[in-house]
Swiss-Prot record:
One of its GO terms (biological process) is proteolysis involved in protein catabolic process. GO terms for cellular component: HslUV protease complex. This is ATP-dependent Clp protease ATP-binding subunit ClpX. It comes from Chlamydia abortus (strain DSM 27085 / S26/3). PANTHER family: ATP-DEPENDENT CLP PROTEASE ATP-BINDING SUBUNIT CLPX-LIKE, MITOCHONDRIAL, ATP-DEPENDENT CLP PROTEASE ATP-BINDING SUBUNIT CLPX-LIKE, MITOCHONDRIAL-RELATED. One of its GO terms (molecular function) is ATP-dependent protein folding chaperone. The lineage of its organism: Bacteria, Pseudomonadati, Chlamydiota, Chlamydiia, Chlamydiales. HAMAP family: ClpX (MF_00175). Zn(2+) binds at C9, C12, C31, C34.
Amino acid sequence: MNKKNLTICSFCGRSEKDVEKLIAGPSVYICDYCIKLCSGILDKKPTSTSSSGASTETAPQHPDLQVLTPKEIKKHIDKYVVGQERAKKTIAVAVYNHYKRIRALLNNKHVSYGKSNVLLLGPTGSGKTLIAKTLAKILDVPFTIADATTLTEAGYVGEDVENIVLRLLQAADYDVARAERGIIYIDEIDKIGRTTANVSITRDVSGEGVQQALLKIIEGTTANVPPKGGRKHPNQEYIRVNTENILFIVGGAFVNLDKIIAKRLGKTTIGFSDDLGDFSQKDRDHLLTKVETEDLIAFGMIPEFVGRFNCIVNCEELSLDELVAILTEPTNAIVKQYIELFSEENVKLIFEKEALYAIAKKAKLAKTGARALGMILENLLRDLMFEIPSDPTVEAIRIQEDTILENKAPVIIRRAPEAIA
């Protein structure tokens, strides 16, 4: 059969070779893919009615897209994220401007300002991922997390960047319009920096190439997403997702970036030692507030990639007091969770203040920030959670400082015999 004689779908242009079924009508054809698409549209809530009485599909107005003020956004983040005041304020403004821009576009207003993508710097366990997760929860938008170290450029073994968009689409239950205003958080972004500032002669599969691959979807493009994931191949069906209004937040520890900044500023002018050895954490946090795009380029990020992020902010290492606050203050604080778990067994779990600080000190020594807190508490309470459901005599458990620092057994308070009966 000649190519010009191939029967094609009148709606999408796919040939009979590219589809499973092609249904004929009077001088028109429709493929199975377009039928599924139309079915999805008909399943949605009723739309406007034309003068002839027929129901017509109109552009979505997204009445549920509420734009909170920066203060409202920060207030909500404060319920879950301890510390990082500067980062929370900066991100609140960026997110406000981002969704204000989307609302203006949906209302067919001319918008001259670009996307407010965010780059978060900071050590492991400082709250970067939690801030992104909390934003998605506040705004009630789809959210997904990707690990930059698993991504490769097209043609290499690994994960295509389009699969990140697929995961967002899955989080939106394949509602394309909803996914198109979601949030994607890419962790470990510093790991795809070039090892040197000089352009590599050989291909850098997991570094510069990935940055190049991410450029378009971060800036805004129509991505052809394979609905089942994996590598693309000819004749495969794709779901088209416009990434123009997806908010991208990327984060990384950027180890030694502080030294690059110090070198640019001139170490003798900012009060640091003459050798560019290890700074104190306070010095590092201060230096990272001075970060410029040229520092990130010197670190190994390509200029085009850095240019996609007009909001760059540092998350500081958490202090001892902040780690204690994380244990007890947020709405979903981990100590509150364990207290609730034990109360389900009619047992009162008590943490002395000194014990909380001992846990925080132990977490700080682990060098993984708030992430270590959960592991420490799990190891501490695991045996108790095993025994308590089978022991009705236990009324309360008191966790003291020596329980943490010297591995002494917690104080167990038992009920009077008559209370058990």
